[in-house]
Regions:
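Short loop/turn segments that flank or connect secondary-structure elements
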Residues: 1-271
Length: 271
């Protein structure tokens, strides 16, 4: 049997072996949206029943850019998906004070908190990079604490962070794709797929990330499974009734026993 070499993913050699391979067995469940019989939802049970959790602010988070562990996955700024996403961000910014946002003066200054960058061959808005990372990222030493100013403010206001952050930020590391599918009888349905936003989700640049959390056992230490810890986000992506159906499916699958357990969750040990 031929043994294929492990792909380095652009990491330092000292980090090799820490992340599991990208390709492994997954279990999927499909169900129809209770509110729309022409909407099929395909869900990755291997990911949703994993114990991944965000480890930002701990030694386990090594950052996607070498030498910048305190950035987490915020080094590159966030592309805005559409006009609504930008309007929501603008509203969120109005709620931030100097005590919330380390770079508020810069963000509200002449250069602003957004800049144009290329995505898929087009110029699109993204949050501005300032001193090597997203301008909304509070750095070590800031009295208000490190991390996303928008996320922290949402917690202070006792609202879900997804209500204040750009879409790409609160969805990560959930990946939702949608496509119209032709059925054999000529009818069409909308198919939504929910899965892990792994390195490949970042496109060609994903292979060059210094480190990425979803494949590292050190990030699979959550007390709750992803379908539970990301309940608000999944509800926003699918709708309340569809999420309730998904939750029922996850509970049932967990009770029966998952065959294709996420290898990073396995490597992390008992939960």
């Amino acid at each position: 049997m031929t043994t294929l070499p492990k792909q380095p993913f652009g990491r330092d050699a000292s980090l090799d072996g820490q992340e599991v391979e990208l390709d492994f067995a997954r279990e999927w469940v499909e169900f129809y949206d209770p509110e729309n019989p022409e909407h099929l939802i395909k869900t990755d049970m291997t990911w949703l029943l994993s114990h991944w959790t965000c480890v930002f602010g701990t030694p386990a988070c090594q950052g996607t850019v070498a030498g910048r562990p305190d950035d987490g996955c915020c080094s590159h700024g966030a592309f805005l998906s559409d006009a609504d996403d930008r309007a929501n961000l603008d509203d969120s910014v109005k709620k931030l004070t100097d005590a919330d946002w380390q770079f508020r003066e810069k963000g509200l200054g002449r250069k602003g908190y957004l800049e144009k960058d290329e995505l898929d061959g087009e110029k699109q808005w993204r949050t501005r990079k300032y001193k090597g990372a997203c301008i909304f990222l509070n750095r070590p030493g800031f009295a208000g604490g490190i991390g996303c100013a928008l996320h922290s403010k949402a917690l202070k206001l006792d609202v879900e962070p997804l209500t204040m952050k750009p879409e790409v930020c609160w969805q990560l590391p959930i990946r939702r794709t949608q496509a119209w599918v032709d059925r054999p009888d000529g009818s069409q349905i909308l198919k939504t797929t929910i899965t892990e936003y792994d390195r490949r989700g970042w496109g060609e640049g994903g292979a060059d990330l210094h480190w990425y959390c979803t494949g590292d056992p050190a990030a699979h230490i959550g007390k709750k499974q992803v379908w539970q810890s990301y309940g608000p986000e999944l509800t926003e992506l699918l709708g309340e009734k569809a999420y309730a159906e998904l939750a029922t499916m996850c509970k049932r699958r967990q009770g029966l026993g998952l065959i294709a357990v996420h290898p990073a969750t396995v490597a992390a040990g008992p939960h």
